[in-house]
Design a protein with these regions (language model features):
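Alpha-helical membrane-protein topology signature
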Residues: 6-9, 27, 56-58
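Short acidic, gly/pro-rich beta-turn/loop elements at beta-sheet edges
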Residues: 16, 25, 69
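Generic ordered-secondary-structure signal
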Residues: 8, 20, 45, 51-53
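A generic structural signal for ordered secondary structure
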Residues: 13, 17, 34, 40, ...
Length: 72
């Protein structure tokens, strides 16, 4: 697991993700034509109360992967 630093609108964020999740997080940002900071900020707004952002990012990536597999 590696800690990554992001920024958006003057705010700094850090997130620790395994290499595979980081790669998929970057792919999500690319697919949505967003910076990593924009994607993090967008996900932060929808993070369930009591959840961590790391968990929310992993869950979002997992749900996206499942949806794509079902659509294929």
């Amino acid at each position: 697991m590696t800690k990554h630093s992001l920024s958006f609108r003057g705010h700094k964020y850090s997130v620790s993700l395994e290499a595979e999740f980081w790669r998929m997080f970057k792919a999500m940002a690319r697919d949505h034509d967003m910076t990593l900071g924009q994607l993090y900020w967008g996900l932060e707004k929808s993070c369930p109360e009591g959840s961590t952002m790391t968990s929310h990012i992993r869950t979002t990536i997992l749900n996206r992967t499942i949806a794509r597999a079902r659509a294929a």
